[in-house]
């Protein structure tokens, strides 16, 4: 069968089939084989088997269309009508029909049974014979039980008759004794007639009366005893009959259960045999068919499907038949189970992400409430410490220098009164070692959407990212901006360097709003909507600037498991940092601008930083990196 048959034979074979199948429909040899089987069952009138084949194969059998051409699939293949597979199958069916013309039931008027039907008839005959044998056994058992019952009844009747005969004999003996005694009494009366008549009659009555009463009482007692014995015997007989009936019923039930089990086992064996036969037929046909599958030879596909740990199954150049014998058809049940397992894993991952996101949001809400309380406490303390000074105003956009001078003066006076509350300065100011004043109130933006201020108004500002108390609904990041204003160099009193040089302990919780640390990035709902596990997320290295800030940032740094974890750090783009910091130093502002911080993300693109600072979310920085593609691969990411 390795060479293709001539075309005239294939045409004759195709004419015999009502709906031929060609390679144009599918490149999968298994699907084509199933299609041929389906058409064969349909043409031979086996519609039930055809439907069962469709159900078992999950409707993967390609069906013919109503067009005159036969099939409408636009698969790549030769333009010839008579392809190799069509010719081969046509020749195969023609040979089978010529060898056994009785295979087709539609053209079988003589009623000769096919081998399949013969097997079915034989199985039915065997089942009938087994049932008949079981019925005969049951009948024989029933007959034996009936004979035993009849024998027992005869024995009981004989016993009763014997007892009745014995009772009659006793009664006759009693009657005879009575008659003999009466005769003796009559003789005694005749002999004693010479005596007084009254005395004789009394003596006779006294002698006769006790004897008659005793005899009657004894007869009654014997009758009662006999009746009681008969009742006991009847009860025993009834109990024995009930026990026998129960035993018979139990035996019948056991026999029925055994029959049912045998039938079930037979059915299972038949189903297994059918499945094995069907799989063998499919495997042999798929092994023998030399059709090209998806543009690749079948031998290569079989080599790919084999495990690498079985070198004995690898094909040799001399033996190509071993490759065909090692193929295994993929069952649809395993495919369904794998899909169900994958969906369950996705659901579990989503549930874990949702629970972790809720925990994160709850922690952030508590953190925001703590910050608000700290702000209120700091405001109350500042008001109590400086009762004669007005509260320091919070510059929103740092537009003028007059507001900067007023805030710096208020800060100097507050530092003179309470040097403990203004202990720390930013990391950027420590690197440059220039005197910079920081306002007492946290200069925080009202909304988290303003990520960068205007270029004209940001000459004296160091832009960094921080965790914002509000979650954005649109963006990928939420930032909090803190601004820092350089002050003109002014003569400072002697108490100021002392307050700066001294390292006094202070309440770090009250100074959380006065810090400008390296800013951490927060991922909001848009990032967590992906199927990612937070436990598997590797965080990035953080700068060491947060190590000397005490315990004030414990709430900020303990987002996961309350440990000092590594964080993601952003900085301004290099071009913008180079453009802004020289302008700050050139204005004579006294050491403006902080040190440039390294950008750990090369694949992350931020905005141009030229937003107007009006609170528009459209100008916020956006991460353009595809996180899902970079977090690994799997069945769902192919």
Swiss-Prot record:
Role, per record: Transcription factor that regulates pseudohyphal differentiation, invasive growth, floculation, adhesion and starch metabolism in response to nutrient availability.
GO cellular component: cytoplasm; nucleus
Any one Gene Ontology BP term: positive regulation of transcription by RNA polymerase II
Keywords per UniProt: Activator, Cytoplasm, Nucleus, Transcription, Transcription regulation
GO MF annotations in UniProt: DNA-binding transcription factor activity
Compositional bias ranges of the Basic residues kind: 412-423
Record field: compositional bias (Low complexity): 296-328, 369-387, 394-408, 425-465, 495-515, 572-585
Record bears the keyword Transcription: yes
Family: Belongs to the MSS11 family.
Compositional bias segments (type: Gly residues): 586-595
InterPro entries membership: LisH
Biased composition range(s): Polar residues: 8-26, 283-295, 466-481
Native organism: Candida albicans (strain SC5314 / ATCC MYA-2876)
Protein name as it appears in the record: Transcription activator MSS11
Protein localization: Cytoplasm; Nucleus
Self-association and partners: Interacts with FLO8.
Domain LisH residues, every copy: 29-61
UniProt key word Cytoplasm: yes
């Amino acid at each position: 069968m390795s060479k293709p048959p001539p075309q005239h034979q294939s045409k004759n074979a195709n004419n015999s089939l009502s709906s031929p199948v060609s390679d144009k429909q599918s490149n999968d040899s298994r699907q084509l084989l199933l299609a041929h089987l389906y058409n064969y069952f349909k043409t031979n009138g086996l519609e039930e088997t055809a439907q069962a084949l469709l159900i078992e194969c999950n409707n993967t059998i390609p069906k013919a269309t109503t067009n005159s051409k036969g099939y409408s699939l636009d698969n790549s293949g030769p333009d010839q009508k008579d392809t190799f597979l069509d010719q081969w199958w046509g020749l195969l069916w023609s040979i089978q029909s010529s060898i056994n013309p009785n295979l087709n039931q539609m053209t079988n008027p003589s009623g000769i049974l096919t081998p399949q039907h013969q097997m079915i008839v034989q199985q039915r005959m065997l089942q009938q014979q087994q049932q008949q044998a079981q019925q005969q056994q049951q009948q024989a058992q029933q007959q034996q039980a009936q004979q035993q019952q009849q024998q027992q009844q005869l024995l009981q009747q004989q016993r009763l008759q014997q007892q009745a005969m014995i009772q009659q004999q006793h009664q006759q003996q009693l009657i005879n004794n009575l008659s003999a005694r009466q005769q003796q009494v009559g003789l005694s009366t005749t002999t004693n007639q010479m005596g007084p008549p009254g005395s004789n009659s009394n003596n006779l009555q006294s002698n006769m009366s006790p004897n008659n009463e005793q005899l009657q009482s004894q007869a009654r007692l014997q009758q009662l005893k006999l009746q009681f014995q008969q009742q006991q015997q009847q009860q025993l007989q009834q109990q024995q009959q009930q026990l026998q009936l129960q035993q018979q019923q139990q035996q019948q039930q056991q026999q029925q259960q055994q029959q049912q089990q045998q039938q079930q086992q037979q059915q299972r064996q038949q189903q297994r045999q059918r499945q094995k036969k069907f799989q063998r037929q499919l495997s042999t046909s798929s092994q023998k068919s030399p059709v090209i599958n998806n543009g690749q030879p079948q031998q290569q596909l079989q080599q790919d499907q084999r495990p690498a740990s079985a070198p004995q199954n690898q094909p040799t150049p001399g033996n190509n038949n071993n490759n065909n014998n090692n193929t295994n058809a993929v069952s649809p049940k395993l495919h369904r189970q794998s899909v169900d397992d994958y969906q369950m894993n996705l659901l579990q991952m989503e549930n874990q992400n949702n629970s972790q996101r809720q925990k994160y949001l709850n922690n952030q809400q508590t953190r925001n409430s703590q910050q608000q309380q700290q702000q209120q406490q700091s405001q109350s303390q500042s008001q109590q410490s400086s009762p004669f000074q007005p509260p320091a105003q919070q510059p929103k956009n740092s537009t003028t220098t007059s507001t900067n001078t007023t805030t710096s003066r208020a800060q100097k006076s507050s530092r003179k009164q309470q040097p403990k509350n203004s202990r720390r300065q930013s990391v950027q100011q420590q690197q440059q070692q220039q005197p910079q004043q920081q306002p007492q109130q946290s200069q925080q933006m009202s909304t988290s959407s303003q990520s960068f201020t205007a270029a004209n108004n940001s000459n004296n500002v160091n832009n960094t990212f921080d965790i914002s108390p509000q979650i954005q609904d649109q963006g990928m990041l939420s930032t909090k901006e803190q601004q820092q204003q350089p002050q003109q160099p002014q003569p400072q009193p002697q108490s100021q360097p002392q307050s700066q040089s001294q390292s006094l302990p202070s309440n770090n919780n009250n100074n959380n709003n006065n810090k400008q640390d390296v800013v951490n990035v927060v991922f909001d709902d848009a990032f967590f909507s992906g199927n990612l596990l937070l436990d598997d997320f590797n965080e990035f290295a953080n700068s060491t600037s947060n190590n000397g800030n005490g315990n004030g940032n414990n709430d900020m740094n303990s987002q996961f498991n309350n440990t000092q974890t590594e964080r993601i750090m952003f900085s301004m783009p290099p071009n913008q940092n180079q453009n802004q910091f020289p302008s700050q130093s050139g204005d004579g502002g006294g050491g403006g601008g902080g040190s440039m911080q390294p950008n750990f993300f090369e694949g992350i693109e931020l905005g141009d930083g030229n937003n107007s600072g009006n609170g528009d979310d459209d100008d916020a920085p956006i991460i353009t990196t595809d996180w899902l593609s970079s977090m690994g691969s799997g069945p769902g990411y192919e």
